């Protein structure tokens, strides 16, 4: 597998090192003495004792206010502000994740136990939505590969399927207009994609546990794919030998595919993917636009996964 090399970052995106280190010192102090990583089962954010990893980029992140108020999470509503407005009743704790299917050691795992077993890393990734907007987000989490190693996939396993929780009493979008979707929300990856070092199970961002609107308490982050692959509030992970269909692929197969790799050369049927609107940047005239990079800037690390594939046909 190619060694990791950070995507090229424009100088305008760089955060001064002294400011970055002060933030880390503050978060580290806040995490000292914490009895539980999430606090007493509250939905409010709690500090995470995350450590920097080799994937940590010294980028200027999207402001926290934008990251937590401009979201797609249809379980809570259709508008970008709905998840923040409508997710207050959602209870992210206690939480377990069931891992089953083609594995030697299936099980149902307590999330807080997993967070103690696997070191929490801080990684800053670009996030590119299929709607042609983007953010730069400092995530906290552990590699999906760590959990997969724990359950020991069988040699016959080829894919990994993911499932979101169904709680219509706490997630109003599941009983509103979008109840026509086949809940639960589901997603999938090839096993080699799931095991790639960049693929993260995020449990926090900006050094704190995930807010409900960002996918609390655990979500998938695959930085070279469009954001809809980042399934939120995961309760089940299944290893299989069949390619799983994702929710949007089932709903509209002409517009959404299985792979969803960021590709400026393959337009969405209704808009161009050649550039993106960076949320949190720009002034009076709106957010600035950036050229979209193949695989969202991670081509050196992941392009080999798709060698010989027709990326237009396998969108």
From Swiss-Prot:
Its GO biological process annotations read: protein repair
User: Which cofactors does the annotated protein need, by name?
Assistant: Mo-molybdopterin
What does this chain do?
Part of the MsrPQ system that repairs oxidized periplasmic proteins containing methionine sulfoxide residues (Met-O), using respiratory chain electrons. Thus protects these proteins from oxidative-stress damage caused by reactive species of oxygen and chlorine generated by the host defense mechanisms. MsrPQ is essential for the maintenance of envelope integrity under bleach stress, rescuing a wide series of structurally unrelated periplasmic proteins from methionine oxidation.
Which species is this UniProt entry from? Rhizobium etli (strain CIAT 652)
Does Phosphoprotein show up as a keyword for this record? no
Q: Could you give a GO molecular-function term held by this entry? A: molybdopterin cofactor binding
- Write the protein's name: Protein-methionine-sulfoxide reductase catalytic subunit MsrP
What does the UniProt keyword field contain? Metal-binding, Molybdenum, Oxidoreductase, Periplasm, Signal
This protein's assembly is summarised as: Heterodimer of a catalytic subunit (MsrP) and a heme-binding subunit (MsrQ).
Which SUPFAM superfamilies does this entry report, sorted A to Z? Oxidoreductase molybdopterin-binding domain
The record's section on PROSITE patterns has: TAT
What is one Pfam family matched by this protein? Oxidored_molyb
InterPro entries found in the cross-reference section: MsrP (IPR022867), OxRdtase_Mopterin-bd_dom (IPR000572), OxRdtase_Mopterin-bd_sf (IPR036374), TAT_signal (IPR006311)
**Family in the record:** Belongs to the MsrP family.
GO cellular component annotations of the record? periplasmic space
What the entry says about post-translational processing? Predicted to be exported by the Tat system. The position of the signal peptide cleavage has not been experimentally proven.
The catalysed reaction is: L-methionyl-[protein] + a quinone + H2O = L-methionyl-(S)-S-oxide-[protein] + a quinol; L-methionyl-[protein] + a quinone + H2O = L-methionyl-(R)-S-oxide-[protein] + a quinol
- Residue numbers binding Mo-molybdopterin: 71, 74-75, 129, 164, 214, 219, 230-232
Q: How is the cofactor bound?
A: Binds 1 Mo-molybdopterin (Mo-MPT) cofactor per subunit.
Q: What is its EC number?
A: 1.8.5.-
Give the gene that encodes this protein: msrP
Range of residues in the leader sequence: 1-45
Localization (cell): Periplasm
